[in-house]
Amino acid sequence: MKVLVLESIPQEYKEKLESVAGTDITYTNKNEVTQEQLQQSEVIIGNPTMEQLDTCDALQWLQLSSAGANTYAAHPKQFTLTNASGAYGVAISEYMLTCTLNALKHFPEYLHLQSEKVWENLGHVATISDCTV
């Protein structure tokens, strides 16, 4: 089975993929992938462009590296489509917590003032303690 990986993945994941018998794996990215690689791949891991997907004659399975799959689901080619839904839950949660704390503590404003070498108190800062966030 010809597998095309269009994402940078950790070595441990490469080793797991390569342990599957009968796989011929190519690692590249969607900016450097060749027409021949796209045409011959039965499995693609990553998010090819729609134009690239149009040329994937042998494609049986597309594993997206993103959660959003609407554009790919609407593609007329028939293939199994899976996404990375749930893979980013912790990262998104941490990002939202960071955004909330940045807003409550005036971090962007203080960072700007600090870069200007201005030491000004911006007043009351809120806390997330006892809050519904």
Residue ranges with predicted function:
Residues 1-41:
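N-terminal glycine-/charge-rich "phosphate-binding" loop or analogous flexible N-terminal tail
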Residues 17, 35, 71-73, 124-126:
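Short secondary-structure boundary/capping segments
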